[in-house]
Amino acid sequence: AQGAKPGEGGHLPGKKVYPWIAKTRCSIPGVTLISPPPHHDIYSIEDLAQLIYDMKNVNRRARISVKLVSEAGVGTIAAGVAKAGAQVVLISGHDGGTGAAPRSSITGAGLPWELGVAEAHQTLIQNGLRSQVVIEADGKLMTGRDVAIACMLGAEEFGFATAPLVAMGCCMMRVCSLDTCPAGIATQDPELRKRFSGKPEYIVNFMYFVAQELREYMAKLGIPTVDRLVGRGDLLQVREKLVTHRAETLDLSVLLQNPYGENVPHFDPAAVYDFHLEKTADMGILMEKLGKSLKSKKSGRLEVQVSSTDRAFGTLFGSEIIRQCGNELPE
């Protein structure tokens, strides 16, 4: 999902598909590449749950994140994602996204992250799932004020992309899709890339300023930590005397409701979804019988009776082989 162009997939214009890009993507130089937006292995929450389970078997230490575009009803989807075992639900707003997206998508598709974050947060609380997942917000977050608002609406993590790009030298020429970026960022042209003058320290400094502004807002509100700010929509106020009369007719009370006061439910590491991987056949049989052979990097043989309830059989053990032996076969 992408907030800038939901349902359209990623676009890589043919002009930017240089030979080394084409080789990586198994394509032909100069051919436009469009990533298909639908995931044909995910047509239901059950399909998503199976994929998350498979990924968790591949890497037990992984924190699985699912990205959702802010839209009406995203709270229901977020609840399903939490039940499927994801640890992070990312709500992506319409303002952000790649500069190579079609202009019609950038200006006319998607909804603000504020609506999606508030709905997801409140729906997860109503279903008793809020402590299981982290809510992350992204989509043109630019300042500490944006972070404070996102936090008060229910987010615990925050994604930045456009603002750090500007800190690295992006001058917002809106030519990301043309391979003519004058700052040398959104281009594969070797000559233009020489113009890139960004440094990691620039982003570090920018983030320090964002954090400082957030601290100032928290001080004004009397909030000591970010955790205490999560979900405090009651601290937000609707602006009055807006420029347009149409905006004054909006009712934002649903977004700002908080019946929990200072004790707003939010992510608790102790309540993370338990996949019970220790009960799988991989851990109970393969690791038990072949663990010593794995540590000594010797071959082993084992006959196991597998049933349909042994999902992703061999995946977890295979991940341990790669972790200990690397992903290349010995010469």
In which residue ranges do the predicted regions lie?
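Mobile "lid/hinge" segments at catalytic clefts and subdomain interfaces of large enzymes
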Residues: A1-P29, G154-T244, E248-T249, S253
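Conserved catalytic alpha/beta cores of large enzymes that bind or transform nucleotide phosphates
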Residues: G7-E8, Y18-M55
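Terminal amphipathic helices with adjacent charged low-complexity linkers/tails
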Residues: P13-K16, K67, A82-T98, I223-T280
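Short acidic (Asp/Glu) and glycine-rich catalytic loops that position anionic groups and cofactors
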Residues: I28-T32, N57-V58, G96-A100, I185-F196, ...
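Glycine-rich phosphate/ribose-binding loops and adjacent secondary-structure elements
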Residues: H39-K194, T309-D310, G314-S319, Q324, ...
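Charge-rich, low-hydrophobicity low-complexity segments
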Residues: A247-E331
